[in-house]
Amino acid sequence: MVSRCTHARIASVNTSRNPGLLWPGNEEIVQDTGTNAVYLDHAATTPLRTEALEAMIPYFTEVFGNPSSIHTLGQEARRALESAREVVSKVLECRASEVVFTGGGTESDNAAIRGGAFALKQAGNHIVTTEVEHHAVLHTCHQLENFGFEVTYVPVDSDGLVDPEAVAAAVTDKTVIVSVMYVNNEIGTVQPIREISNLVRERAEAIGRTILIHTDAVQAAGYLNLSVKELGVDMLSLSAHKFHGPKGVGILYIKRGTPLVPLLMGGGQERERRSGTENIAGIVGTATALKLSEEERESTSIHCRELRDRIIAAIPELIPGTLLNGHPIKRLDNNVNVCFPGLEAEPVLLGLDLKGIFASSGSACSTASLEPSHVLTAIGRPADIARGSLRITVGRETTDGDVDYFLETVQSVVQRLRELPSFRLHNR
């Protein structure tokens, strides 16, 4: 069993009735249980590790100098910054000079794709990506289309896997960037990045092109190998709060010699790749969390995989008609994504929330949208079913008891909702 993270479980949650969250017939669902919270939304964010917090505190109150200052306090901050960069470089198996700290995963994706596209615009105006990327990639590509770039969105199969041959086949003599995510943030499908990079390199060599390869690896940290040598990429994005680090800090690996126009202009920090005074406390916490996540990767993966497999096996037995989204095997160790046909996600999530269980319907970056998940529609789910997806993502601190309570509760919530007249009328 993986040791529990002391900040992972909220001590108590007020699950008393909220009139604004009631709907006819759910009175039994929303009764106050008085239980501790069960957090099952680790794909959205993770609790800050105690070790990371403790490492950060001195840089808020004592070593608060600007790392660009030449005085002693500034140089102490500079040493902390470069030490953190070394830690990250060891995990990524790259040079420290190739590590750039950003404000988060979204900024890292934007900097990689926009920066690479504009740097190579004279050579070509074509980008290749997939239909199931995070919005930080998709919306960036959509915007670049307004600047004269052409984008090919390669489809995926019913499990969310992209065919590496299809990615390579999409490359033309105008292609400048290929961006494929390492792990899908909604359904957990793991893409064959090494195979994709090999085929794209071969294709680029055959047509005499320089093509940059980027992967959004935000969901992979702590579960999969992040070696850029093994992955064969030119750029890789990470976000600290996905691996028990602080919010507001990202990482962008940029291979030496990669042409890139900076997204942010200013004082030329981060070797002129990302201007702006560095967030030293956040960066120190990020390096601490990433190092520990890598050291514990095997044990965390085993622990989470066992819990994940329990949930995947149990839910269809408890709730007939359940559909599993994502690849049954090639998926992240902590991810479960299911649909309950005939039910939308919101009432299920509210029912769980009012019992002290926190999950989500998909990407936390777009949960306010009424549109069905673009990922689920890309794998062939009809819009009405896609709107009913439930994403459960366990973590290093999740226990067997948490899973027991979740399974018991989700069965009760779904059963109660299916007994409502509105459900029976809708599904006649």
Model-derived regions, located:
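Pyridoxal 5′-phosphate
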Residues: 4-5, 10-14, 18-428
